[in-house]
Amino acid sequence: MRKLTALFVASTLALGAANLAHAADTTTAAPADAKPMMHHKGKFGPHQDMMFKDLNLTDAQKQQIREIMKGQRDQMKRPPLEERRAMHDIIASDTFDKAKAEAQIAKMEEQRKANMLAHMETQNKIYNILTPEQKKQFNANFEKRLTERPAAKGKMPATAE
């Protein structure tokens, strides 16, 4: 029985080592000059691709948009460390203090409101650098996005039968 167990362990280790060696040989490294993956981010930020699709922006317009977006990025700040710690303290306490949580939420809502206002102002600035034809296409893209049903996340598309 001991010989059988030893043989089993030895063969398992040998096969495991062979698989590791094979896996190491077949993996490919990313090129040294490759950019890191930007998940869900278009040319101008997340969810901006649909907005600018088929607008045929000029290089000057693209540069103006980059400058506008850079200005907004400088305005958009993460919640201060104290706020994040306060939120953690509420979550990690032994008892839930509803009044404290509501006060923290109110503070966070003020910041969210300011961010939304800045975002809408930025969108307006971008819209106003477009030509009349581009504005027409922009509005068509907006309407299309409103009427399209978003795909469920993590689900496979339905098969057409």
UniProtKB/Swiss-Prot annotation:
Biased composition (Basic and acidic residues): 142-151
One MF annotation (Gene Ontology) recorded for this entry: unfolded protein binding
Location in the cell: Periplasm
Record keywords: Chaperone, Periplasm, Signal, Stress response
Subunit annotation: Homodimer.
Region (Disordered): 141-161
KW Signal (keyword) present: yes
Protein family (similarity comment): Belongs to the CpxP/Spy family.
Source organism of this protein record: Escherichia coli O157:H7
Annotated signal sequence range: 1-23
Protein task: An ATP-independent periplasmic chaperone, decreases protein aggregation and helps protein refolding. Binds substrate over a large region. Protect proteins in vitro against tannin inactivation; tannins have antimicrobial activity. Overexpression enhances the stability of otherwise unstable periplasmic proteins.
Domain comment, as recorded: Has an elongated cradle shape.
Alphabetical list of InterPro entries matching this protein: Cpx_auxiliary_protein, LTXXQ
Gene assigned in the entry: spy
GO cellular component, one term: outer membrane-bounded periplasmic space
Domain of life: Bacteria
Entry protein name: Periplasmic chaperone Spy
